[in-house]
Amino acid sequence: MPHIELKTVEQLRWMREAGLVVASIHEALRAAVRPGITTRELDEVSAQAIADGGGASNFLGYYGYPATVCISVNDVIVHGIPGDYELAPGDIVSFDCGAFIERGGKQWHGDAAFSVIVGEQFIEDADFAAGTRATGAIAGVDQDLLRERRELDAVTRESLWAALAGLATGKRISAVGKAVETVVAENALINGWEAGIVEEFV
C-alpha cells in the first residue's frame, strides 16, 4: 500500500497560508476582468497579487513558462499563455493560479483555478450553492452560445463542490476525481452534451 504522509498542524498552517495567497490572486483577477483588457495585463495583476501576499510564483519559469498565471479563453482547454488577446463580452475564461511560500526550509504550494464569463457579475460561492445562476442577455453575444457557456460554468462549479464534499478523513485523493467525473457525466446525459474529462491533461 502506498505511503500516506500525515501533515503536522504547523505544516497544515503553511499549506493554508499558500492557499490564501492563491485566493488573493483570484480576488484580484475577478475584480480586474472586463472587456478590452488583455490577458497579459491580467498576468500583471496576478504577479502583483502574489507579491502583495508575500509569495512567489510557482508557474513563472517552470519549464520556461513565461507568466504567473495560465489564462485559457473559450476553446483553449488549459494552460493558455497570457498575451495580447483582448477579452470580449461573452468570453468564458479560465484562470489557473498558483503561488508558493517558503517555511520550515521547504516550499509550500497553492494552486487553484476558477472561470468567469466576461460581462457577467461573478456569483459568489455561497450564492451559487443556494441556487443563484446568471440570467439575461449580454449585448452582442449570441444567446445560445451564452447559454452553453453558462451551463459549462455551472457544471464545472458543481463538480468542484462535489469533489470537496467527497473529501473526508480516511478517504483517498482518488475520491476527488471520481466525484468530478460523476457530476460531469450526469450533466452531460441530462443536457445531451458530448462532454467529459479531458484525460490527456489529467
Residue locations for each model-derived region?
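Active-site neighborhoods and metal-handling regions in enzymes and metal-associated proteins
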Residues: 1-202
